[in-house]
Amino acid sequence: MTTSGGLTGPGAFGRLPQPFHQPGITSFVEFLALQAPDLLPGRLQMPAGGQPPEVPHGTTIVAVAYQGGVVMAGDRRATMGNVIAQRDIEKVFQTDEHSCVGIAGSAGIALEVVRLFQVELEHYEKLQGTTLSLEGKANRLAMMIRANLPMALQGLAVVPLFAGYDLFADDPQRAGRIFSFDVTGGRYEEHSFHAVGSGSTFARGALKKLFRDDFDEPHAVRTCIEALYDAADDDSATGGPDLTRRIYPVVAVVDANGFRRLADDTVGGVVEQVIAARMANPGGPVAVLP
């Protein structure tokens, strides 16, 4: 008896096809490229001379390292040209127990890349019995972004921000690490803080003035929200806190205990503090000169 999957013999029904039994491939993306390349992100091609379609774009993501971990936050707005496509999109996601990723760029493709990246890390852990190092995870994500280059050249780019807690760091106080990428798959480690997306210029300016080496988690969370507020103040594609709809930034913390997304009530309390302070000083906090 021969099944549609190419298996023969009694009991063949319900068994995995032969390609799933090949040893040596720890990368799910590599396996998919060999067996079903049409399922990978970036497989679509536009006609020559065609214009990229109007698609929702994620905007601003920020990350701040503090003593013992890292905080990542993202606004909730997606834009499509000059239109607000969505007011409550989520752009910060857990990728495994000790890392997270934030997305900017073409939202649909970025979300597909994130889901595939989550499967990639889980696949490796199940086959190897251990997790990739933080740098190994960043390298895998860079490889996936590089595979999307044909779409990026056609106007559908994905630019994520990756952060996590390095379980193998020599100094646990410096274990929070941040990695940025370009559309070609270039991977760069950032120090202390970073921002990506349309409002990143304004967010990085705020982070540069507010960051301190002795930050703890509450200070890092407050600084991320201040930076997103400044980005929304100057960039129309970045959404500020929406108190009437109770839509607040997504804020995630990664430390030695793992990934943790802050509850909306917690983030809302910090947002209210930021807005109350801005009522007295619309420009926000200023750096203290020596």
Curated annotation (Swiss-Prot):
- Gene3D superfamilies per UniProt: Glutamine Phosphoribosylpyrophosphate, subunit 1, domain 1 (3.60.20.10)
Q: Signal peptide span per the entry? A: none
Catalytic residues, chain numbering: 59
The EC code for this enzyme is 3.4.25.1
Citing just one GO molecular function, the answer is: threonine-type endopeptidase activity
Its keywords, alphabetically, are:
Autocatalytic cleavage, Cytoplasm, Hydrolase, Protease, Proteasome, Threonine protease, Zymogen
Q: Which residues form the propeptide?
A: 1-58
Query: Is Protease among the key words of this record?
Result: yes
Cellular component, GO annotation:
cytoplasm; proteasome core complex, beta-subunit complex
PANTHER family of this UniProt entry? Answer: ATP-DEPENDENT PROTEASE SUBUNIT HSLV, METALLOPROTEASE TLDD
Q: Which NCBIfam families match?
A: 20S_bact_beta
- Activity control: The formation of the proteasomal ATPase ARC-20S proteasome complex, likely via the docking of the C-termini of ARC into the intersubunit pockets in the alpha-rings, may trigger opening of the gate for substrate entry. Interconversion between the open-gate and close-gate conformations leads to a dynamic regulation of the 20S proteasome proteolysis activity.
Q: Which domain of life is it from?
A: Bacteria
Which BP terms does GO give this entry? modification-dependent protein catabolic process; proteasomal protein catabolic process
Functional description taken from the UniProt entry: Component of the proteasome core, a large protease complex with broad specificity involved in protein degradation.
- Supply the name of the protein: Proteasome subunit beta
Say where the protein is mainly found.
cytoplasm
Similarity comment text for this entry:
Belongs to the peptidase T1B family.
